[in-house]
Amino acid sequence: MSNKVHLGHTARKRFGQNFLTDENVINRIVGAISPDNDHVMVEIGPGLAALTEPVASGIDKLIVVELDKDLVERLQTHPVLKDKLEIHQGDALKFDFNQLVREDKQMKVFGNLPYNISTPLMFHLFEFAQHIENMHFMLQKEVVLRLSASPGTKAYGRLTVMAQYHCQVMPVLEVPPGCFTPPPKVDSAVVRLVPYKNKPWPCKDVDLLRNLTTTAFNMRRKTLRNNLKQLLSDEDFAELGIDATLRPEQIRVDQYVAMANHVFDKK
């Protein structure tokens, strides 16, 4: 049997499917998620239910978002899960997570995410951060390093700034390729993201912050002065107390927020 086949399902490359099969890793992730009935529990990409089954076993209801129609059908007929699941068949990148919000409950979101959509999905989920208690995701290790990076490091970039603006970021564990079927070509890791209830550095326009950081990191080897010359003058940098000769990866999250707020105030 091909190593792409697990529990009778052939992994689809276009969906980025790698199914988690290591019981020890699964148990550690479920422990980190800490499922309960006090939150709206949401899984993205349940796949063959490696996390779905142990999470659902201890709660009354689990909401899942799955793109693959074949996997949706498996879940709908699952002997144990079918009565506990609320299944949404569709693309998580386009899914409106606000529809899952309950007045008295925050969401806990988790999943073994397809690596080919992990970065855009992070940006999509940040839009709903005010309704999320925490998130636990299996990601490519490189993406977890980018999420948790410090200024001045190679991994520090646009994703770092936006993730750390919205959330506390904590790596949980590293997961080698042998824990999956089929094994991915890269190492994986689990990350915990806890959205701030009160942002340490409030931003007046988050879209502006996102656009400014994208512009700043478009050319990493060039200086802030060069990359942001359409937005900020030397006088602006001086007023902010930011050295315009620095490169984008040398600037802290709070400094990016200060720059975005300054541009907003100039409008």
Curated annotation (Swiss-Prot):
It catalyses: adenosine(1518)/adenosine(1519) in 16S rRNA + 4 S-adenosyl-L-methionine = N(6)-dimethyladenosine(1518)/N(6)-dimethyladenosine(1519) in 16S rRNA + 4 S-adenosyl-L-homocysteine + 4 H(+). It comes from the Bacteria. PROSITE patterns: RRNA_A_DIMETH (PS01131), SAM_RNA_A_N6_MT (PS51689). Its main location: cytoplasm. It is an enzyme of class 2 (transferase). It holds the Pfam family RrnaAD. GO terms for molecular function: 16S rRNA (adenine(1518)-N(6)/adenine(1519)-N(6))-dimethyltransferase activity; RNA binding. Keywords: Cytoplasm, Methyltransferase, RNA-binding, rRNA processing, S-adenosyl-L-methionine, Transferase. It is found in: Cytoplasm. Its EC number is 2.1.1.182. Gene3D superfamilies: Ribosomal RNA adenine dimethylase-like, domain 2 (1.10.8.100), Vaccinia Virus protein VP39 (3.40.50.150). One of its GO terms (cellular component) is cytosol. InterPro entries: KsgA/Erm, rRNA_Ade_diMease-like_C, rRNA_Ade_Mease_Trfase_CS, rRNA_Ade_methylase_Trfase_N, rRNA_adenine_dimethylase, SAM-dependent_MTases_sf. S-adenosyl-L-methionine binds at residues 18, 20, 45, 66, 91, 112. SUPFAM superfamilies: S-adenosyl-L-methionine-dependent methyltransferases. Belongs to the class I-like SAM-binding methyltransferase superfamily. rRNA adenine N(6)-methyltransferase family. RsmA subfamily. Specifically dimethylates two adjacent adenosines (A1518 and A1519) in the loop of a conserved hairpin near the 3'-end of 16S rRNA in the 30S particle. May play a critical role in biogenesis of 30S subunits. This is Ribosomal RNA small subunit methyltransferase A. The gene is rsmA.
